[in-house]
Amino acid sequence: MEPIKNIPRLCRTLGYDFSELALLDHALTHRSAASKHNERLEFLGDSILSIIISDALYHQFPKATEGDLSRMRATLVCGKMLAEIGFEFKLGDYLKLGPGELKSGGFRRESIIADAVEAIIGAVYLDSDLEVTRSLVLGWYKTRLETIQPINQKDPKTLLQELLQGYKKPLPVYKVTDIRGEAHAQTFTIECYVEELRKPVVGVASSRRKAEQLAAAQALELIKR
């Protein structure tokens, strides 16, 4: 972790100078490191980020449907996208983690990085106001907002369901066939049953949702052949 004297370097990377550096320090503190951690700031930042991105998409795509707007927002505020931003900022170098998380590589774990990004957004809001925070966040998201489009925002499960509905076929059925690993690092195996396919297709991932999406993506490929 970077020494505290290098926090100004992080401020330059973020593009924001904190009046109250303690807020940034708080945002970088994981629950494993102290009783006063960043989860409340994360909660606040999550809501503010949603407002900022929702507003930006609403004005950027005046003809987009509610469903398209929701899917684009989900893409932009998902944990993977937030972690991507956090890694660009090298946030892992500045996080305050407990010994256990340090040992297990928490400074490079996507979920921890993503949570810290949301906490920083919350901290910036408390240190300034909504408009300053909006300007900062939109700067972080500039290229992402420029490239995102309503098309191709539907996830594989939605696409598979719509395809089958178009053919007036039964909807797919997803079944969990295996769960392995400890609670914090489980692997899910999902089978997707589609009438059009002779055998179920299988998806394996770190969450049930991801496994279902992988299975649905495979089913789509097979049906379209």
From Swiss-Prot:
Listed Pfam families: dsrm (PF00035), Ribonucleas_3_3 (PF14622)
GO CC annotation terms, alphabetical: cytoplasm
Every RNase III domain range: 7-129
EC number: 3.1.26.3
Keyword Ribonucleoprotein in record: no
Binding sites annotated in the UniProt record for Mg(2+): E42, D115, E118
Family membership noted in the UniProt record: Belongs to the ribonuclease III family.
PANTHER family noted in UniProt: RIBONUCLEASE 3, RIBONUCLEASE III
Summary of subunit composition and partner proteins: Homodimer.
Protein name, as recorded: Ribonuclease 3
Native source organism of the sequence: Shewanella woodyi (strain ATCC 51908 / MS32)
